C-alpha cells in the first residue's frame, strides 16, 4: 500500500517567512497511521527551514543530502538546492525517490521536486503535498485581504486546508524566520 498524505506550506509576507506542516500520515486511501508526524525541521544553524511530502524514508534521504549541500555551501540555499537537484536528476537511486521538499531561508523559497526541478514561486507562497493547492489558494487570499502575519496566514491556511483535504490534519509544526 502507498503511504501518503500531507500538506507543507510556505508563506513569505511582510519581511518574514513561515513554514507549516501537518502531522498526518495516511496508509492508502482510508487509514490514518499517525497524527503527530513532524515533517518540518530547521537546518543549517537554524537559518533554513525544510518540509517534506512523500514517503518518509525517501524524504529523510533527501533531507540528509540537502543538509550536506547546505554545509558544503555554507548555508547558501540557492546553491544547495541546485546541487541537490542536479544530483537528483543524475543519480538512478535518487530518481526513484517519492518525495518533495519545500525549503526556505530569509530570502528564498524553493520547491524541490522529484524530477529534479527547483521552483521559486513568484509571490513567496508555495505548498507541496495532497493539500498543497488548497493551502496556496487560502494563503494568497489571506495575504491579499488581511493584515495577518506570515505565521498567522500559514496557520489559518492550514486550518482551511484541513477542513477540505482528508489527508491533512491540524497537528501543525510551524517554524518562522
From Swiss-Prot:
This is ATP-dependent protease subunit HslV. One of its GO terms (biological process) is proteolysis involved in protein catabolic process. CDD domains: protease_HslV (cd01913). Pfam families: Proteasome. Na(+) binds at residues 162, 165, 168. Belongs to the peptidase T1B family. HslV subfamily. It is an enzyme of class 3 (hydrolase). It is found in: Cytoplasm. The keyword Protease applies. Protease subunit of a proteasome-like degradation complex believed to be a general protein degrading machinery. SUPFAM superfamilies: N-terminal nucleophile aminohydrolases (Ntn hydrolases). The keyword Secreted does not apply. GO terms for cellular component: HslUV protease complex; proteasome core complex. A double ring-shaped homohexamer of HslV is capped on each side by a ring-shaped HslU homohexamer. The assembly of the HslU/HslV complex is dependent on binding of ATP. InterPro entries: ATP-dep_Prtase_HsIV_su, Ntn_hydrolases_N, Proteasome_sua/b, Proteasome_suB-type. GO terms for molecular function: metal ion binding; threonine-type endopeptidase activity. The active site is at residue 6. Keywords: Allosteric enzyme, Cytoplasm, Hydrolase, Metal-binding, Protease, Sodium, Threonine protease. Allosterically activated by HslU binding. It catalyses: ATP-dependent cleavage of peptide bonds with broad specificity. Transmembrane segments: none annotated. Its EC number is 3.4.25.2.
Amino acid at each position: 500500500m502507498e503511504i501518503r498524505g500531507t500538506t507543507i506550506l510556505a508563506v513569505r509576507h511582510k519581511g518574514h517567512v513561515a513554514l507549516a506542516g501537518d502531522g498526518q500520515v495516511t496508509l492508502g486511501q482510508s487509514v490514518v497511521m499517525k497524527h503527530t508526524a513532524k515533517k518540518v525541521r530547521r537546518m543549517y544553524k537554524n537559518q533554513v527551514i525544510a518540509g517534506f511530502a512523500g514517503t518518509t524514508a525517501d524524504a529523510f534521504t533527501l533531507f540528509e543530502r540537502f543538509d550536506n549541500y547546505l554545509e558544503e555551501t555554507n548555508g547558501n540555499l540557492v546553491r544547495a538546492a541546485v546541487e541537490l537537484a542536479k544530483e537528483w536528476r543524475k543519480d538512478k537511486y535518487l530518481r526513484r525517490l517519492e518525495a518533495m521538499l519545500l525549503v526556505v531561508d530569509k530570502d528564498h523559497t524553493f520547491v524541490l521536486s522529484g524530477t529534479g526541478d527547483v521552483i521559486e514561486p513568484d509571490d513567496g507562497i508555495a505548498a507541496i503535498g495532497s493539500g498543497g493547492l488548497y493551502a496556496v489558494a487560502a494563503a494568497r487570499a489571506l495575504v491579499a485581504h488581511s493584515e495577518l502575519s506570515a505565521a498567522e496566514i500559514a496557520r489559518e491556511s492550514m486550518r482551511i486546508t484541513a477542513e477540505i483535504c482528508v489527508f491533512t490534519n491540524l497537528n501543525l509544526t510551524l517554524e518562522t524566520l
